[in-house]
């Protein structure tokens, strides 16, 4: 009698964040089904957990229209080859991890062949290009969503979606140790401290750094002991920021950090940051914040017409109200930014109320996402 085939899960991750999610999912599945087989497109973390890589993740990790066009033939070849090989393999479940432009079409191809499909990490369909929800619904048996309002959006369109909580909320403590973070960064425990996070993209650093630095100068007039920490994602962004600082605020003393954004947030009394995942991380660090953002005028005009949400920052979307001040476009200027930050640096009623709400929101999305994702995969595999 032939031995029963082990549970077989196919996965495709297209970037580092997906590799981290995939590794966590594989770990949770292996704890329950030790002989399970994992195959697909994997990064080093997924491979270390035992995923057999038919293609390296770097093959899919292309950013920008020019880069994608240059690699389009190769990407289409990989997707066609994966469709063929997964169809032959007939895995119990296929999990596309993020990378929606690549994965959702692949999921649709496989669903037509009778393979059960999951899309792990919802694209921002609730914010813009909402009609994508129909393609997602046709292509997947289940979407795994990090945030509760994402599930509420899919429910409106009768697309099966499971809220699993956010892996970042699982990884960060409910009550971070501010003094320990200050010790790491060399910040005195009794000083006022402001974190500036002008974004991870070159265009963001270019558009925001000067105003963020001028804001810090204004705040130092009010708080002469103000320590300013500026974590930058890589050497390129650091060089770019240093050049702008030399022109705008050469005499402003700041702590420039290579990475270490999380430590900077935990150590600080307040943060001024571009929107995006940084705002969620700052919320989980329990650091009161102001969001400042500016784009090229035409890009902003277009965004206002495309984006369907009332707020841009994740803390506000989670709270369903303006918990965090958002100063966008012409409002993103030093005087207004400084006025919004002053009550947060005072460390009084305003910042305490924000801190308490951040903690409540953290608890809402701290659900052991790896285990929840594994539950969803195993339920679909039955």
Swiss-Prot record:
EC number(s) per entry: 2.4.1.182
One GO molecular-function entry: lipid-A-disaccharide synthase activity
GO cellular component: membrane
InterPro entries with a match to the protein in the record: Glyco_trans_19
GO BP: any one term: lipid A biosynthetic process
Alphabetical UniProt keywords: Glycosyltransferase, Lipid A biosynthesis, Lipid biosynthesis, Lipid metabolism, Transferase
CDD domains, A to Z: Glycosyltransferase_GTB-type (cd01635)
Reactions mediated catalytically: 2-N,3-O-bis[(3R)-3-hydroxytetradecanoyl]-alpha-D-glucosaminyl 1-phosphate + UDP-2-N,3-O-bis[(3R)-3-hydroxytetradecanoyl]-alpha-D-glucosamine = lipid A disaccharide (E. coli) + UDP + H(+); a lipid X + a UDP-2-N,3-O-bis[(3R)-3-hydroxyacyl]-alpha-D-glucosamine = a lipid A disaccharide + UDP + H(+)
SUPFAM superfamilies, per database record: UDP-Glycosyltransferase/glycogen phosphorylase (SSF53756)
The protein's annotated pathway: Glycolipid biosynthesis; lipid IV(A) biosynthesis; lipid IV(A) from (3R)-3-hydroxytetradecanoyl-[acyl-carrier-protein] and UDP-N-acetyl-alpha-D-glucosamine: step 5/6
Highest taxon in the source lineage: Bacteria
Alphabetized Pfam families for the sequence: LpxB
Family recorded in the similarity comment: Belongs to the LpxB family.
Its job: Condensation of UDP-2,3-diacylglucosamine and 2,3-diacylglucosamine-1-phosphate to form lipid A disaccharide, a precursor of lipid A, a phosphorylated glycolipid that anchors the lipopolysaccharide to the outer membrane of the cell.
Name of the protein in its database record: Lipid-A-disaccharide synthase
């Amino acid at each position: 009698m032939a031995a029963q085939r082990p549970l077989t899960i196919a996965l495709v991750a297209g970037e580092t964040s997906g590799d981290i999610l995939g590794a966590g999912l594989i770990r949770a599945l292996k704890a329950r089904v030790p002989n399970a087989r994992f195959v697909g497109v994997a990064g080093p973390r997924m491979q270390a957990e035992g995923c057999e890589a038919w293609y390296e993740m770097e093959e899919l990790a292309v950013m920008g229209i020019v880069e994608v066009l240059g690699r389009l033939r190769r990407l289409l070849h990989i997707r066609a080859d994966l469709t063929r090989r997964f169809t032959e393999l007939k895995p119990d479940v296929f999990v596309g991890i993020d990378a929606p432009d690549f994965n959702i079409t692949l999921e649709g191809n496989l669903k037509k062949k009778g393979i059960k499909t999951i899309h792990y990490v919802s694209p921002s369909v609730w914010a813009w290009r909402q009609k994508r929800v129909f393609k997602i619904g046709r292509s997947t048996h289940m979407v795994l969503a990090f945030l509760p309002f994402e599930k509420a959006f899919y429910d409106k369109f009768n697309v099966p979606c499971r809220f699993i909580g956010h892996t970042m909320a699982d990884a960060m403590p409910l009550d971070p140790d501010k003094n320990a973070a200050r010790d790491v960064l060399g910040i005195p425990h009794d000083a006022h401290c402001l974190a500036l996070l002008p974004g991870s993209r070159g265009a963001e650093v270019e558009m925001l750094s000067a105003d963020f630095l001028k804001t810090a100068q204004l705040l130092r007039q009010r708080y002469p002991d103000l320590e300013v920490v500026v974590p930058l994602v890589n050497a390129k962004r650091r060089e770019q920021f240093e050049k702008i600082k030399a022109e705008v605020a050469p005499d402003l003393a700041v702590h420039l950090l290579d990475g270490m954004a999380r430590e900077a947030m935990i150590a600080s009394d307040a943060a001024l940051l571009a929107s995006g995942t940084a705002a969620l991380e700052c919320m989980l660090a329990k650091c009161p914040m102001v969001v400042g953002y500016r784009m090229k005028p035409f890009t902003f005009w277009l965004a206002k017409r495309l984006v369907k949400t009332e707020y841009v920052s994740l803390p506000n979307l989670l709270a369903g109200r303006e918990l965090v001040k958002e100063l966008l476009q012409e409002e993103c200027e030093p005087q207004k930014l400084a006025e919004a930050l002053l009550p947060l640096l005072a460390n009084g009623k305003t910042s305490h109320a924000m801190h308490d709400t951040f903690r409540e929101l953290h608890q809402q999305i701290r659900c052991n996402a790896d285990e929840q994702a594994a539950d969803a995969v195993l339920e679909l595999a039955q």
